[in-house]
């Protein structure tokens, strides 16, 4: 029996460093940022969910289910992950941000292999130097643990990792895979990277 793996693209933040622009909808090389992310992960998963707390109608135009946080008040990526975990029947959920248009094409395969090899509950990606805290594969049955963590006032996702058997998978062989956009200057640099990829 093959595993079902779904994905959630996190587009629920406030994007303060981008002047408040909705990062997933910022245009990059003629496409919305989230479209680049969708193209990278679609071949790797069964279903895609989009977590968005504004512009939901616009996000729905991409043809996927759009979910707003169950917890109100822009509580960060944990809130979006909790919501998505409550809407999937998959064996695993891939979590990615909306502003990483160069995500690895073998992201799921490698994160899943890391989980299975280490009998872990979740795997987090690393660029070889730094962990990418919102690029992970996890079991949706971790939802209650994450929900309790958030409702206790915690926000730091790496503190939540520490409560579970988490493995880190290095993608040092793809150094630009997790380059994202937080400023207009980064957007310009990334546009050039995409042209070369």
UniProtKB/Swiss-Prot annotation:
Cell compartments where the protein resides: Cytoplasm
Binding site for Mg(2+): 99
Species of origin: Shewanella oneidensis (strain ATCC 700550 / JCM 31522 / CIP 106686 / LMG 19005 / NCIMB 14063 / MR-1)
EC number in record: 2.7.7.77
Cofactor: Mg(2+)
Molecular functions (GO terms): GTP binding; metal ion binding; molybdenum cofactor guanylyltransferase activity; nucleotidyltransferase activity
Broadest EC class assigned to this enzyme: transferase
UniProt entry keywords in alphabetical sequence: Cytoplasm, GTP-binding, Magnesium, Metal-binding, Molybdenum cofactor biosynthesis, Nucleotide-binding, Transferase
UniProt xrefs under HAMAP family: MobA
Annotated Gene3D superfamilies: Spore Coat Polysaccharide Biosynthesis Protein SpsA, Chain A
Subunit comment: Monomer.
GO biological process per UniProt: bis(molybdopterin guanine dinucleotide)molybdenum biosynthetic process
InterPro entries hit by this protein: MobA-like_NTP_Trfase, Molybde_CF_guanTrfase, Nucleotide-diphossugar_trans
Protein function: Transfers a GMP moiety from GTP to Mo-molybdopterin (Mo-MPT) cofactor (Moco or molybdenum cofactor) to form Mo-molybdopterin guanine dinucleotide (Mo-MGD) cofactor.
Entry keyword annotation includes Oxidoreductase: no
Keyword hit for Transcription: no
GO CC annotation terms, alphabetical: cytoplasm
Protein name according to UniProt: Molybdenum cofactor guanylyltransferase
Record SUPFAM superfamilies: Nucleotide-diphospho-sugar transferases
Main localization category: cytoplasm
Recorded catalytic activity of this chain's protein: Mo-molybdopterin + GTP + H(+) = Mo-molybdopterin guanine dinucleotide + diphosphate
């Amino acid at each position: 029996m093959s595993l079902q793996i779904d994905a959630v693209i996190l587009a629920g933040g406030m994007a303060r460093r981008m002047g408040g622009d909705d990062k997933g909808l910022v245009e990059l090389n003629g496409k919305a940022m989230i479209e680049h992310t969708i193209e990278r992960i679609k071949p790797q998963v069964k279903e895609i969910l989009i977590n968005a707390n504004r512009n939901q109608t616009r996000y729905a135009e991409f043809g996927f289910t759009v979910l707003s946080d169950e917890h109100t008040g822009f509580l960060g990526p944990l809130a979006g992950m909790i919501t998505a975990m409550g809407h999937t029947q998959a064996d695993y959920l891939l979590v990615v941000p909306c502003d990483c248009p160069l995500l690895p094409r073998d992201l799921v395969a490698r994160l899943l292999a890391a989980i299975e090899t280490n009998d872990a509950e979740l795997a987090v990606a690393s660029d070889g130097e730094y962990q990418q805290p919102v690029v992970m594969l996890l079991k949706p049955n971790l939802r209650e643990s994450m929900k309790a963590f958030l409702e206790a006032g915690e926000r730091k996702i790496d503190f939540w990792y520490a409560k579970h058997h988490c493995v880190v998978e290095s993608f040092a062989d793809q150094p630009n895979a997790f380059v994202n956009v937080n400023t207009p200057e980064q957007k310009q640099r990334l546009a050039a990277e995409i042209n070369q990829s």
